[in-house]
C-alpha cells in the first residue's frame, strides 16, 4: 500500500489517508478481503497519530469501503460501486469546493474555472 500525505496541505491528514486508501480500492490495488495494516503500524509508518488512522479507517468502514473484524483488524469490503456512488460524488464535491475557494482567491471567474474542468475531464 503506497500512501503519501502532505502535512502542509489544507486537507486534514485523515481525509488524505482516506482518499488514498479509497483510490487504491477503486483502482484495484487493494483487493476485496485484503487486510489493511493495523492502525498502530500504519500510524508509525506514516509518522501520524493513531487517532488519524483510526478516524480514516472508521470513516471508510462507514462509507462501505472497509469492514472490521474484532481482534483481527480492518479489511477491504466487497465494494458495491452503485452503493458508494454517493460517497464518490461527495468526495468530488469537496475537492471542487477547495478549487472554488482557490479560484476566488485569485479572482478567477466561474466560466474560466469551468473551462479548466472541461479541459481536465
What kind of feature is each model-predicted range?
Residues 1-35, 41, 90-120:
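Extreme N-terminal segment that seeds HTH/winged-HTH DNA-binding domains in transcriptional regulators
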